[in-house]
Amino acid sequence: MSTDAQQDSRDSRDGRDGRDGSGNQDFQDWQRWHEERIVAVAAPHGPLSLTGTHWLSDYPDGRIPAVPGQWRTGRDEVVLTGAPEDGLTVDGKPLAGEAGLTADRGPIGSSRVARGERRLVLLSREGQWAVREFDPHSPARHDFRTIDATPYDARWSLEGTFRPYDTARTVRVANADGRERGLGLGGEIAFTLDGTEHTLQAAVEPDGSLWAVFADATSGNSSYRFRFLRPGAPDEDGRVKVDFNRALLPPCAFADHFICPFPPPGNTLTAAVAAGERNRIDA
């Protein structure tokens, strides 16, 4: 790693104008969140370490260049065939023969298939299988310096209301890899900014929290082309905190091989959201 992540994040506070609430608990909580984000992104198997997403439909013979083993799709699994010279392990044990694999769900570092420090992670999207390769020695991880983020400003911590749809819906949206896929949506978040009501369509996560993909007037200019927002679970009356100070860069801001969805229709705000994470900064 080319720099100390926590020091970089502290340096980003230089020059704040006093409107950020730096003496209060909200700012301190945000600063801690920001520092933890930098550390997580820069982790050995964090998003910076992704060096490839290989769709098995592109390799009918199951042989992926520079990835050991043979990967063949079955009905509900992928069958990996390996020889001792491939250097593959499955569940920590050397692979010599076949192993049936399903999609990995846990942390990248605990994925079932490895080759030394590299992790080979199975991904399933709309019936298509892919192998993702995470390498702690990736050029992106080596070059990473910090995440550029706007210091906390209470103006961007808003009260919102979640309005669930009667029935969950799926819309087709372009993804960062150029393909179009379905994006599940469970409702919309309504909030008021400078006297104007705005809404964002959002997905509902298994734990009840929300997830929205949005763009705004800063996107592609002073910030990345789109960002994520992850509010907590609404209360029983639908009230939810909409804190743009914690707007996140999507994984594809850190590695080109992620397949992040673009914002769905209606999720491009006319306002300039000068808050949250803006861009990745490299050395």
Question: Predicted regions span which residues?
Answer:
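Surface-exposed beta-loop interaction hotspot
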Residues: 116-185, 192
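Intrinsically disordered, low-complexity terminal tails and inter-domain linkers enriched
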Residues: 3-28
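Extended, aromatic/histidine-rich regions of cofactor-dependent oxidoreductases associated
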Residues: 239, 245-283
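Protease-labile, long low-complexity intrinsically disordered regions enriched in Pro/Ser/Thr
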Residues: 87-132, 136
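Extracellular/luminal recognition modules and glycoprotein regions
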Residues: 36, 41-58, 62, 67-68
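Short strand-coil-strand connectors
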Residues: 65-67, 91, 114-116, 192-196, ...
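Forkhead-associated
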Residues: 56-104
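Acidic/His-leaning functional-site neighborhoods
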Residues: 188-235, 245
